Each structure stands twice: as C-alpha cells, then as structure tokens.
Curated annotation (Swiss-Prot):
This is Regulatory protein YlbF. One of its GO terms (cellular component) is cytoplasm. The keyword Repeat does not apply. Pfam families: Com_YlbF. Regulates sporulation prior to stage II. Positively controls the competence regulator ComK at a post-transcriptional level. May modulate the translation, stability or activity of ComS. May work together with YmcA to regulate community development. It comes from Bacillus subtilis (strain 168). Keywords: Competence, Cytoplasm, Sporulation. It is found in: Cytoplasm. It comes from the Bacteria. The gene is ylbF. InterPro entries: Bact_com_dev_regulator, Com_YlbF, YheA/YmcA-like_dom_sf.
Amino acid sequence: MYATMESVRLQSEAQQLAEMILQSETAENYRNCYKRLQEDEEAGRIIRSFIKIKEQYEDVQRFGKYHPDYREISRKMREIKRELDLNDKVADFKRAENELQSILDEVSVEIGTAVSEHVKVPTGNPYFDGLSSCGGGCGSGGSCGCKVS
C-alpha cells in the first residue's frame, strides 16, 4: 500500500512540474511559434514540398549515385532544405522548440542525478549527456562507458 501511495504522490508532483513547464514563457513562446507556423501558407507550402522531395530522396538513396535521378533529386533536396531553413516562421519554431527541449533536458538530468549519479539519462544533447553517466542511446549495455549497475 505504501509503494502505491508513494507512486501516486510522485506522479502528482510530476504533473505539477509538467504544469509549471507548460505555463512557462518558453512553452508559451513554443505554442505561439507553432501556431504562427501552422497559419503561414508559405511555410506550409515549403513543408509539403520538403516532405514530397524527401520521399523521392529516400527512394533515390536506396540506389545511391547509380539511380538515374540521383543528382537532380539530391539538388532539389538541398534547395528545399535551404528554403525551409531560411523561412522565418520555421526558424522561429525550431529555435523555440530547442529552447523548450533544453528545459526538458535540464529537468531530466536534474531529477536523474538527484536520484543517483549512476542513473542513465539520455537526452540527445551532448552537453547534458556528458553530465549524465550515459553517453546517450547506448541501450544501457555499458559499451559506451556508462556505469551499468
């Protein structure tokens, strides 16, 4: 019974933490950028084009430079990727997304290291993965040098 009550309390506190993050300026900025991105017709056109060319690019990559359309599709992919990256709404959204992800990474590492310095907390962020005992994505087999308990 005690473990169940403790689990309920921990989940409740985790929900409170999630609510605090949701109410943060960073999360609000993320939602605003996402909304602006969704409402922008030009960004939508670029994203749809990117998805279409990406599918073609993945098909071409199976055969590599031996595919007859390899050069053309690769060129189109670079062009649309550049157009996507240079779009203000897309850039703002990516920046907001990275800022929110940084907060989530910080919280994950903080909680993990508070429990134990040996807890593996892969974040996908090289800075935070260096602070954790896990190099990220190791499958906890210890081959990355992390401390497997």
